[in-house]
Curated annotation (Swiss-Prot):
InterPro entries: Glyco_hydro_1, Glyco_hydro_1_AS, Glyco_hydro_1_N_CS, Glycoside_hydrolase_SF. It holds the Pfam family Glyco_hydro_1. It comes from Escherichia coli (strain K12). Its EC number is 3.2.1.86. Gene3D superfamilies: Glycosidases. The gene is ascB. Belongs to the glycosyl hydrolase 1 family. Keywords: Glycosidase, Hydrolase. The keyword Ribosomal protein does not apply. It catalyses: 6-phospho-beta-D-glucosyl-(1->4)-D-glucose + H2O = D-glucose 6-phosphate + D-glucose. The keyword Acyltransferase does not apply. It comes from the Bacteria. PROSITE patterns: GLYCOSYL_HYDROL_F1_1, GLYCOSYL_HYDROL_F1_2. This is 6-phospho-beta-glucosidase AscB. GO terms for biological process: carbohydrate catabolic process; cellobiose catabolic process.
Amino acid sequence: MSVFPESFLWGGALAANQSEGAFREGDKGLTTVDMIPHGEHRMAVKLGLEKRFQLRDDEFYPSHEATDFYHRYKEDIALMAEMGFKVFRTSIAWSRLFPQGDEITPNQQGIAFYRSVFEECKKYGIEPLVTLCHFDVPMHLVTEYGSWRNRKLVEFFSRYARTCFEAFDGLVKYWLTFNEINIMLHSPFSGAGLVFEEGENQDQVKYQAAHHQLVASALATKIAHEVNPQNQVGCMLAGGNFYPYSCKPEDVWAALEKDRENLFFIDVQARGTYPAYSARVFREKGVTINKAPGDDEILKNTVDFVSFSYYASRCASAEMNANNSSAANVVKSLRNPYLQVSDWGWGIDPLGLRITMNMMYDRYQKPLFLVENGLGAKDEFAANGEINDDYRISYLREHIRAMGEAIADGIPLMGYTTWGCIDLVSASTGEMSKRYGFVFVDRDDAGNGTLTRTRKKSFWWYKKVIASNGEDLE
């Protein structure tokens, strides 16, 4: 008998900014991700260190066409249904509904598109799990308001959220507010549209922007419950706990501090108040949070569940050695000598998933939802035209087993959506060659290819996993 409950939501995940393409169709406005190029300038732009407010003819922007989900969503959702998906996680591009972000009324073409996507899901009995903001702030809000450093974005986001909850009521009941909200600290332009001026206190800017996002998230949660009490709203963490690099007490403390840095956002979203440790963190970083009257009351609108991504665990030491570092999901870490690594240097640690889940449930006592997990790898066609991605099957098998162990530990896990179920553009590198999917998309790092979809060996394996409710993993 399977350890997974009968109601368990098996599926996969994509994101608008990495799969839709059609970046100017349907009156869509430009977003932050549309300004992030492939190549040598990518990281500086993502970090908010290089200002890019105009597109350049000499640069390639992977998100502009991506994998063309905008025109091929029916084909892609049919492939998901063939695998037996119970849930499909995707996101709404804010600028498809509000091209500039600050309009009073939404763009009906955007609403019609997403309604059609969600209706297609429901046709196959697939529940949409929808992220409101997945690394794509409308560029007008960046250039005119300074993005999330400006309190006005709370108002704009609340209007956008209400529009979504009302327009898609009856089609969507599972919602996430901000994707990997803690990534703002590590990739500020990607996470929050932040661009820094020379000499300013970047920590002050990031944590003030974080406060605005946390208030906006809590308001959205409140609005969702007002529109339909059946709506369930979650937060979303870039997960993966930190191990101390040694049993040296200073390393243990360094790991605790790193965990707190990442969990700070979820502490607020799940508990409804700023954690006690944040006062000292802010003091030492020279940060003063400017709160509006009523903010503390708004923050009490906590999420219904805690969702997270998990790709790898991390290591921390009091003495971080740059020569022994890696960056799993843009979060800096020391290399763990006990782990094998992926093609991109991310440590493979299934037990770390079980550890992370236990830690998070102990901390929050709310249902968990693993909404991103997978192996980025280079896939090649065999002579017979097949893609035998046994390495991906092995990775997923061991992580599903770890999930099962966590459920046996007593943790309520709502579901599991593998990342990039159909190949997409990598958010971190902008590459297509870093593939996660059960379905291969014919497109290369330079944007060439037919976009033809091809089922990989893992497609048939995952179909079997879902059909057996996680019991048949061979």
